[in-house]
């Protein structure tokens, strides 16, 4: 979620703190990327062409197949299956494509993954889980009545980034030769710490709380490469403070008062009113002292002081060395993407060629200021867990689906791997 209403507040009250940039402006720059948020976006932004990744060179699915009947409305099931078919590999497709495009632009990405969430965020995570449960119920109803648009909408609302998604992307990035950081806590906080320590030039994310954690430069839309034409928006935290007329401590209080992931906000106080109150009173303590208690109800035991400490002293690793971008592991990528995840071998080969070409084009000899000195350790180990989808089923690995000319309105027939499919109540 980030900080409620902060984008609008900055657009109105600190317009000069944000500038529009081209991707090319970051050529030669080391950028910390919030990986976990990117993966969520990859899972949400799913198109039909994502299913191409599950086929071989002849367009055929290579897994063991069998068939089953799904006794639901004919015209809505393709939307549901298409979404989850693409979802199975969309995190890998998105991570591969966007990382390649960043490397081709001369950007040196460092992907930072979430660790253990702070205790104060667990209430927000529980709320999100309940929303996914509600979306699953809505999805079931949409399937029953055959509402194709609703099936697609509610399918996306059931999406959750799993450990499997994260582990897959870490493995992919390491095979690509791109550094990975596993944060002990919030990825945004670790990104901000790397930026504050001058180990990276900027932080790329969509959550505005990167600024609250103290990132000197914050980039939005950088990971939209190849999907949107939006320019990159760069925020400079020093200009944010200057334009708003606040200290960093006051800015943190503004963000807490506006609403964040770590505590409830005061109902009726959004970003605009929060800015006015902080400018008038200077800190949350004084705001509460002068707040109209009959108009605004402060949550009981409101932990704003603990949240303030979390933003100022987050759980981050201070012992991270500088980074090295290595040559891609061609054999490893082919095995992981093509053999294990049914990517087209030609697609993998082209991606490797692009990575190598970008590495040659922006070699340390040409960009001397980027010469790294040490690499982050870590290799992928352990048995892969199944991908758990927020759907009427549990673990699911769709292989292919096709309509049968002899199938009646009672349902479609689809070719799937039954051993990994669990549509509760939907399999006849």
Curated annotation (Swiss-Prot):
<keyword id="KW-0227">DNA damage</keyword>
<feature type="binding site">
    <location>
        <position position="98"/>
    </location>
    <ligand>
        <name>DNA</name>
    </ligand>
</feature>
<dbReference type="InterPro" id="IPR019974">
    <property type="entry name" value="XPG_CS"/>
</dbReference>
<dbReference type="GO" id="GO:0005730">
    <property type="term" value="C:nucleolus"/>
</dbReference>
<comment type="function">
    <text>Structure-specific nuclease with 5'-flap endonuclease and 5'-3' exonuclease activities involved in DNA replication and repair. During DNA replication, cleaves the 5'-overhanging flap structure that is generated by displacement synthesis when DNA polymerase encounters the 5'-end of a downstream Okazaki fragment. It enters the flap from the 5'-end and then tracks to cleave the flap base, leaving a nick for ligation. Also involved in the long patch base excision repair (LP-BER) pathway, by cleaving within the apurinic/apyrimidinic (AP) site-terminated flap.</text>
</comment>
<keyword id="KW-0597">Phosphoprotein</keyword>
<feature type="binding site">
    <location>
        <position position="114"/>
    </location>
    <ligand>
        <name>Mg(2+) 1</name>
    </ligand>
</feature>
<dbReference type="Pfam" id="PF00867">
    <property type="entry name" value="XPG_I"/>
</dbReference>
<feature type="binding site">
    <location>
        <position position="207"/>
    </location>
    <ligand>
        <name>Mg(2+) 2</name>
    </ligand>
</feature>
<keyword id="KW-0234">DNA repair</keyword>
<dbReference type="InterPro" id="IPR036279">
    <property type="entry name" value="5-3_exonuclease_C_sf"/>
</dbReference>
<keyword id="KW-0255">Endonuclease</keyword>
<feature type="binding site">
    <location>
        <position position="188"/>
    </location>
    <ligand>
        <name>Mg(2+) 1</name>
    </ligand>
</feature>
<protein>
    <recommendedName>
        <fullName>Flap endonuclease 1-B</fullName>
        <ecNumber>3.1.-.-</ecNumber>
    </recommendedName>
</protein>
<keyword id="KW-0540">Nuclease</keyword>
<keyword id="KW-0378">Hydrolase</keyword>
<dbReference type="GO" id="GO:0043137">
    <property type="term" value="P:DNA replication, removal of RNA primer"/>
</dbReference>
<dbReference type="InterPro" id="IPR029060">
    <property type="entry name" value="PIN-like_dom_sf"/>
</dbReference>
<dbReference type="InterPro" id="IPR023426">
    <property type="entry name" value="Flap_endonuc"/>
</dbReference>
<feature type="binding site">
    <location>
        <position position="186"/>
    </location>
    <ligand>
        <name>Mg(2+) 1</name>
    </ligand>
</feature>
<dbReference type="GO" id="GO:0000287">
    <property type="term" value="F:magnesium ion binding"/>
</dbReference>
<comment type="similarity">
    <text>Belongs to the XPG/RAD2 endonuclease family. FEN1 subfamily.</text>
</comment>
<dbReference type="InterPro" id="IPR006085">
    <property type="entry name" value="XPG_DNA_repair_N"/>
</dbReference>
<keyword id="KW-0496">Mitochondrion</keyword>
<dbReference type="InterPro" id="IPR008918">
    <property type="entry name" value="HhH2"/>
</dbReference>
<comment type="subunit">
    <text>Interacts with PCNA. Three molecules of FEN1 bind to one PCNA trimer with each molecule binding to one PCNA monomer. PCNA stimulates the nuclease activity without altering cleavage specificity.</text>
</comment>
<keyword id="KW-0460">Magnesium</keyword>
<feature type="binding site">
    <location>
        <position position="209"/>
    </location>
    <ligand>
        <name>Mg(2+) 2</name>
    </ligand>
</feature>
<dbReference type="GO" id="GO:0003677">
    <property type="term" value="F:DNA binding"/>
</dbReference>
<feature type="binding site">
    <location>
        <position position="259"/>
    </location>
    <ligand>
        <name>DNA</name>
    </ligand>
</feature>
<feature type="region of interest" description="I-domain">
    <location>
        <begin position="150"/>
        <end position="281"/>
    </location>
</feature>
<feature type="binding site">
    <location>
        <position position="261"/>
    </location>
    <ligand>
        <name>Mg(2+) 2</name>
    </ligand>
</feature>
<keyword id="KW-0235">DNA replication</keyword>
<keyword id="KW-0479">Metal-binding</keyword>
<feature type="binding site">
    <location>
        <position position="34"/>
    </location>
    <ligand>
        <name>Mg(2+) 1</name>
    </ligand>
</feature>
<keyword id="KW-0269">Exonuclease</keyword>
<dbReference type="InterPro" id="IPR006084">
    <property type="entry name" value="XPG/Rad2"/>
</dbReference>
<keyword id="KW-0539">Nucleus</keyword>
<dbReference type="InterPro" id="IPR006086">
    <property type="entry name" value="XPG-I_dom"/>
</dbReference>
<dbReference type="GO" id="GO:0005654">
    <property type="term" value="C:nucleoplasm"/>
</dbReference>
<dbReference type="Pfam" id="PF00752">
    <property type="entry name" value="XPG_N"/>
</dbReference>
<feature type="binding site">
    <location>
        <position position="261"/>
    </location>
    <ligand>
        <name>DNA</name>
    </ligand>
</feature>
């Amino acid at each position: 979620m980030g900080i409620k209403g902060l984008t609008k507040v900055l657009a109105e009250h600190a317009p000069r703190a944000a500038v529009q940039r081209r991707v090319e402006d970051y050529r030669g720059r080391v950028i910390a990327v919030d990986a976990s948020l990117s993966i969520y976006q990859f899972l949400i932004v799913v198109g039909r062409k994502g299913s191409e990744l599950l086929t071989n060179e002849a367009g055929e699915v290579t897994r063991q197949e069998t068939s089953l009947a799904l006794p639901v409305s004919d015209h809505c099931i393709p939307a549901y299956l298409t979404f989850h078919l693409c979802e199975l590999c969309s995190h890998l497709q998105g991570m591969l494509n966007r990382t390649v495009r960043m490397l081709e632009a001369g950007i040196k990405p460092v992907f930072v993954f979430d660790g253990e969430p702070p205790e104060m965020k667990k209430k927000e995570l529980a709320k999100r889980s309940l929303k996914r449960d509600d979306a699953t119920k809505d999805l079931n109803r949409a399937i029953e009545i055959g509402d194709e648009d609703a099936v697609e909408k509610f399918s996306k609302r059931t999406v959750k980034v799993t450990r499997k998604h994260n582990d897959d992307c870490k493995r992919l990035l390491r095979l690509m030769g791109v550094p990975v950081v596993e944060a002990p806590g919030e990825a945004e906080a670790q990104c901000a710490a790397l930026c504050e320590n001058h180990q990276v030039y900027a932080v790329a994310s969509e959550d505005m709380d990167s600024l609250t954690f103290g990132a000197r430069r914050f980039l939005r839309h950088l990971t939209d490469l190849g999907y949107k034409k939006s320019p990159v928006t760069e925020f400079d935290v020093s200009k944010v403070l200057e334009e708003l007329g606040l200290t960093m401590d006051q800015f943190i209080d503004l963000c807490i008062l506006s609403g964040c992931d770590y505590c409830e906000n005061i109902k009726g106080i959004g970003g605009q009113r929060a800015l006015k109150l902080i400018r008038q009173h200077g800190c949350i303590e004084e705001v509460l002292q002068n707040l109209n208690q009959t108009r605004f109800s402060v949550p009981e035991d409101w932990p704003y002081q603990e949240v303030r400490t979390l933003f100022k002293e987050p759980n981050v690793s201070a012992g991270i060395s500088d980074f090295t971008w290595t040559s891609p592991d061609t054999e490893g990528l082919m095995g992981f993407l093509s053999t294990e995840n049914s990517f087209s071998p030609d697609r993998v080969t082209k991606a490797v060629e692009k990575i190598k070409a970008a590495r040659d084009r922006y070699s340390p000899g040409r960009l001397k200021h980027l010469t790294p000195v040490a690499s982050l350790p870590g290799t992928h180990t352990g048995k892969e867990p199944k991908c758990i989808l927020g759907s009427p089923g549990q673990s699911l690995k769709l292989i292919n689906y096709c309509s049968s000319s002899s199938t009646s309105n009672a349902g479609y027939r689809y070719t799937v791997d039954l051993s990994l499919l669990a549509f509760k109540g939907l399999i006849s």
